[in-house]
Amino acid sequence: VTPEEWHFLTRLDVSGLALLPRGDGGTREGLVQVVPTLMLDGGAEFGVNLEAPVRLRLWGGERYAGVIHQEDWDSLSDWGQVIRALKLGSNEAPLALWMGALDSYSLLSGHLVRRYSNRINPDYHPAGGFLTGTLGPLYVEAFASDVLGARLFGAEAEVDLEHVLFGRSVQAGRYTLAVSAVHEGGRGEGTSPEITLAHLDGTAVVWARSSFELHLLAGWGGRPGTGGAWGAVAGVGADAETPSLNARLRLEARRQHGGFRQGAFGPDYELARFRAAGASRQPLAEAPFPEGASVYAEADVGWDAERLVGRMQRHLSFSWAVEVFTSRRVDTDGRIALQLFERNLELALSVLGVGLGRPGARYLVAGELRWRFASRLYALGRGGTPLFPQTDGSLRPGAQASLGVGVDNAR
């Protein structure tokens, strides 16, 4: 990378933040939030985004609470929030590392870890990471939800069968077999029961063109050491990619038995590890899950009227998943983001619903607005309905809203 290819950005956001209780319990708090940010882009092989969010209490909160909102920095894992993103190595490199906030992360096939976010707990701010490596026909991805804590970690190894049997082919990864395992250590911001899940997957690409691919998939998984806990899956997926469009679609039929389910480490897992959605009031590792079948559908679309650049330049980002169970339960989560008026206005809305249609359903909503009204100045607003884990394992519902301004050297 030549010096001319290096780019940097500095940013400072200052906003007022209100934390409000919903229902019984909790206290009202007013804070000032200051977020300095430094980004350095070294091209495809290197990038880093550092930030140090600090929230200062103006009013409210627990008795004898200090000026600094201590929940933001009360554990070793919370220091991981300084690393928003760190990239070493490109997607094509034989070895690459990524660290930071995991947002809608899936571990390869996604049948164990799917659309997982490690910072959905508002008082827990870890840095996660994943390492990818390629050696001949073998591709491996290993991940950790918290590089500073004994939390969720696992890996998936994928073998290119055509490469093994007939040598390197023009189209790599056409027929693959993969095995994955994920373990919850249960230690971090609070403790939760340990759990280990494993899965075997096979994929076959049945139609491929320069910008389109159609594949079939099937798999089987279980909970090692627990008899009768297993699940099976079969489905179809499609990927399309052009300079202005990137789309991934998936449709699956699933079977659950003995408490096992695909995608157990999903979008609400950092809350479910303390209390799963539903009437059981137990952690996910111990909560019963009804036997039956389900249909799972997922769409992930990015579009730009000019050209897709990285993950940031998109006039439209749309990601949604829904799973409908024979037990009359529905799980869904999604996010839509828009860039309008020459990208001066950015809007985003996220929705999460778990256990819909059954007692103890869980709902989360979050929205964000960013309006650039001058070359280096912008206004920003955020709001949402977070759930705060308590020492007894319960989840206290809350609401938050913030409004502020920021300055950067992006333009």
Show the residue positions of the predicted features:
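Signature for the C-terminal beta-barrel architecture of outer-membrane proteins
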Residues: P3-L9, G16, T27-E29, G61, ...
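Hydrophobic alpha-helical hairpins/lids featuring a short glycine-rich hinge
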Residues: K87-S90, A96-L107, P126
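Extended, charged low-complexity segments
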Residues: L347-L349, A366-R411
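Short aromatic-glycine motifs in intrinsically disordered, low-complexity regions
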Residues: Q81-A93, V233-E241, E368
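Surface-exposed loop and membrane-interface regions of Gram-negative outer-membrane beta-barrel proteins
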Residues: G26-R28, G42-A85, L112
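Residue-level recognition of beta-strand termini and adjacent short loop/turns
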Residues: G43, R209, F341, R372-A374
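N-terminal periplasmic/intermembrane-space "pro-region" immediately following the signal or transit peptide
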Residues: V1-G25, V35-G47
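A mature extracytoplasmic/lumenal domain signature
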Residues: A52-V54, E92, A101-D103, D146
